[in-house]
Amino acid sequence: MRSATFFLVSCVLMSFVLSHVKEVEAGLDPMAANLRVRKDIFIGGCGRDGNKTCMKDFVKKGGVMNKPISCECDNLGYEHLCRCNFS
């Protein structure tokens, strides 16, 4: 009897876990899976608009074809760290 109870409880718990995983997967953005993230450090600060600063830095480094979709900028003293998404 104990093993049957244990089996039923295990099945119920597994169904809860699997349904939660399906909910999480349904909430994922399929476009986010196609984005590539690149990081680089550049000289100078982020300025007033770090997103534009990082985009300009990546274009200067690799040309117009190297333009990111969006960026985040962090000041590191005399340098700044850019984390950018590319398609």
From Swiss-Prot:
Q: Name one Pfam family in it.
A: SCRL
Name its cellular compartments: Secreted
The chain's disulfide connectivity reads 46-73, 54-82, 71-84
User: Where does the source fall among the domains of life?
Assistant: Eukaryota
Keywords, sorted A to Z: Antimicrobial, Disulfide bond, Fungicide, Plant defense, Secreted, Signal
GO biological process terms held by the UniProt record: defense response to fungus; killing of cells of another organism; signal transduction
Cellular component annotations (GO), alphabetically ordered: extracellular region
Which interval of the chain is the signal sequence?
1-26
> What does the similarity note say?
Belongs to the DEFL family.
What is the recorded name of this protein? Putative defensin-like protein 235
